[in-house]
């Protein structure tokens, strides 16, 4: 797998925003293409997010390279996390209600022989100028952070836990005070961690979470796969959970990536690792029933490494998947076209779509 960090932005339509009153023929921009905007080193870029109301501002997190920020659409980048005690990043999240609030979860969340761990959660209240360590120090691997879109102090964190041994600080955690205190709200056992989270776009009490039970030591490959993996739903803000099973594989479950269509929140998509049943799954009834829409290896291959799936903000049939190439579907996940990279290519791990301007897509490798 490549060690270079690629970070690409599709910025079709930005000139239209600059000339708001001028009528411009959209055909002029059909020739726009992806371009490499850096930074150039650091490892896998595992997290990428922008600020919807500030389309020139992006943040990325690198598995061994800390957190970086650009304020000029990616032309220049500045490291903003170098003074912290870890450089291993698992995820980051910018609060929609207050873009000065940024959360970082440290520790790349994978099961593989070679990775670096972190030391918990961090928060910045000044857009990355300064940071405060929040806790979850023994988590070691944090893969997903959700911030309530209306309350920047209410967050959910998916903790995978120790990569090479059992520990109890794993599962889904909730905080109502900006990470000053955490409460464990979904937990299976000391061998099973949380890997994925998704939130209903208008009802922040509806949350989806995926648990993953697996382990491999530095000298092994796929040494342990437990029975605790699964997909769960809470309708009361994380107080109680029910497992979603109907239509999903019941044997060999591994990593699951979950996403909600912002414009049609009963539409869910999942990238599911399950041996011969690995593939892209869809639900049209908020997770009650699932069906497989695609099982092509180019879309869902190596599912324990690649598990990033996102939906267009206004069209629930347009879906993006990050894999060795970034793929796009226009028909609800049935068929896919590579839009960046090539089979056997670049290893993409992060996607972000600006909800206010979906022509802006961050694609991180």
Segments (PLM) and residue ranges:
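Bacterial N-terminal signal peptides
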Residues: 8-18
């Amino acid at each position: 797998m490549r060690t270079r960090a690629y970070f690409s932005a599709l910025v079709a339509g930005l000139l239209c925003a600059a000339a708001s009153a001028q009528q411009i023929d959209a055909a002029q921009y059909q020739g726009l293409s992806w371009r490499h905007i850096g930074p150039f080193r650091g490892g896998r870029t595992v997290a990428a997010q922008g600020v919807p109301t500030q389309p020139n501002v992006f943040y990325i997190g690198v598995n061994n390279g800390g957190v970086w920020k650009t304020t000029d659409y990616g032309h220049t980048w500045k490291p903003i996390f170098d003074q912290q005690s870890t450089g291993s990043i698992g995820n980051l999240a910018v609060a929609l209600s207050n873009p000065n609030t940024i959360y970082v979860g440290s520790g790349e969340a994978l099961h593989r022989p070679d990775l670096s761990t972190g030391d918990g959660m961090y928060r910045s209240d000044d857009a990355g100028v300064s940071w405060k360590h929040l806790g979850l120090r023994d988590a070691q691997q944090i893969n997903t952070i959700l911030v309530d879109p209306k309350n920047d102090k209410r967050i959910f964190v998916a903790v995978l836990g120790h990569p090479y041994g059992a520990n109890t600080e794993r599962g889904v955690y909730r905080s109502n005070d900006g990470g000053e205190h955490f409460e464990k709200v979904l937990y299976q056992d000391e061998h099973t961690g949380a890997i994925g989270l998704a939130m209903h776009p208008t009802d922040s009490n509806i949350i989806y979470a995926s648990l993953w039970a697996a382990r491999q030591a530095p000298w092994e490959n796929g040494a342990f796969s437990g029975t605790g993996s699964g997909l769960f739903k809470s309708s009361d803000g994380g107080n109680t959970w029910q497992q979603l099973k109907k239509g999903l594989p019941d044997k060999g479950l591994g990593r699951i990536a979950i996403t909600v269509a912002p414009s049609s929140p009963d539409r869910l998509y999942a990238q599911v690792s399950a041996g011969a049943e690995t593939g892209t799954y869809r639900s049209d009834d908020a997770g009650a029933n699932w069906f497989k829409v695609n099982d092509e290896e180019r879309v869902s291959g190596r599912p324990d490494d690649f598990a990033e799936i996102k939906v267009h903000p206004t069209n629930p049939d347009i879906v993006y998947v990050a894999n060795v190439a970034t793929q796009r579907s226009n028909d609800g996940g049935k068929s896919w076209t590579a839009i960046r990279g090539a089979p056997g290519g670049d290893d993409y791990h992060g996607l972000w779509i600006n909800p206010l301007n979906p022509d802006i897509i961050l694609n991180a490798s």
